[in-house]
């Protein structure tokens, strides 16, 4: 389990104005998934709510917003088993891990950042919310008036983009729209919402996204061919 504590109480960062000196060592991010058990069985929706609460409020306590954004993107990538991308995000933001986990991190100024374990992996006693429809093909939307709304997506480059979306749209369709607007190939895009990787066949209405919510898009562009 590394140095994370398998409990739900959130560890807040150190008090503002008193950054802790970071450890002298920096270990690469470990690939094994941290295991923990919740004090009570929780659903996927409850886990998302806890994560949203943490990510929405953590930057208000201490630390730099760009570091919190990088840690959030790295946590999403690691949970999706894209450890190479997660490590690249950490290295790009000059974040060090004295124990090789995201439970305790330091920026280049020596500020300490602590992530609760529930932001890094689901509990072993997570309650799965299955329905009969999940095993079937996604139903085609019935012909009706398309009700569009502006969907805000935040790229891992830090840029915010607004797409014209409707609830029946699939993530695959929105990836192609982002490609037409920003030139980012759909195969380079990984979409996350509330810590969950969204597949191309996922419809927006299935994510329970609400107005003013933001979808994270991690861009994993392949390196250019060498001469």
UniProtKB/Swiss-Prot annotation:
<comment type="function">
    <text>May be involved in the regulation of cellular senescence through a positive feedback loop with TP53. Is a TP53 downstream target gene that increases the stability of TP53 protein by promoting the ubiquitination and degradation of MDM2.</text>
</comment>
<feature type="region of interest" description="Disordered">
    <location>
        <begin position="1"/>
        <end position="42"/>
    </location>
</feature>
<feature type="compositionally biased region" description="Basic and acidic residues">
    <location>
        <begin position="24"/>
        <end position="38"/>
    </location>
</feature>
<dbReference type="Pfam" id="PF00240">
    <property type="entry name" value="ubiquitin"/>
</dbReference>
<comment type="subunit">
    <text>Interacts with UBTD1.</text>
</comment>
<feature type="domain" description="Ubiquitin-like">
    <location>
        <begin position="149"/>
        <end position="224"/>
    </location>
</feature>
<dbReference type="InterPro" id="IPR029071">
    <property type="entry name" value="Ubiquitin-like_domsf"/>
</dbReference>
<dbReference type="InterPro" id="IPR000626">
    <property type="entry name" value="Ubiquitin-like_dom"/>
</dbReference>
<protein>
    <recommendedName>
        <fullName>Ubiquitin domain-containing protein 1</fullName>
    </recommendedName>
</protein>
<dbReference type="InterPro" id="IPR039869">
    <property type="entry name" value="UBTD1/2"/>
</dbReference>
<dbReference type="InterPro" id="IPR019956">
    <property type="entry name" value="Ubiquitin_dom"/>
</dbReference>
<dbReference type="InterPro" id="IPR032752">
    <property type="entry name" value="DC-UbP/UBTD2_N"/>
</dbReference>
<dbReference type="InterPro" id="IPR038169">
    <property type="entry name" value="DC-UbP/UBTD2_N_sf"/>
</dbReference>
<dbReference type="Pfam" id="PF16455">
    <property type="entry name" value="UBD"/>
</dbReference>
């Amino acid at each position: 389990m590394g140095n994370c504590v398998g409990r739900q109480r959130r560890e807040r960062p150190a008090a503002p104005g008193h950054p802790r000196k970071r450890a002298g060592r920096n270990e690469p991010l470990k690939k094994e998934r941290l295991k923990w058990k919740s004090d009570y069985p929780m659903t996927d929706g409850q886990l998302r709510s806890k994560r949203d609460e943490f990510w929405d409020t953590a930057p208000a306590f201490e630390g730099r917003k760009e570091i919190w954004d990088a840690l959030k993107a790295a946590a999403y990538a690691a949970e999706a088993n894209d450890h190479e991308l997660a490590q690249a995000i950490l290295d790009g933001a000059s974040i060090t891990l004295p124990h090789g986990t995201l439970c305790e991190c330091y920026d280049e100024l020596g500020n300490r950042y602590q992530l609760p374990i529930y932001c890094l992996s689901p509990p072993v006693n997570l309650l799965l919310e299955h329905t009969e429809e999940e095993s079937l093909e996604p139903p085609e939307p019935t012909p009706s008036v398309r009700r569009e709304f502006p969907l805000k997506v935040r790229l891992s480059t830090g840029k915010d983009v607004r797409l014209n979306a409707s609830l029946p749209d699939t993530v695959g369709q929105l990836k192609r729209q982002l490609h037409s607007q920003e030139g980012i190939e759909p195969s380079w895009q990984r979409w996350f919402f509330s810590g969950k990787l969204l597949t191309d066949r996922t419809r927006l209405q299935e994510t329970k996204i609400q107005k003013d919510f933001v979808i994270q898009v991690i861009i994993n562009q392949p390196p250019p061919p060498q001469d």
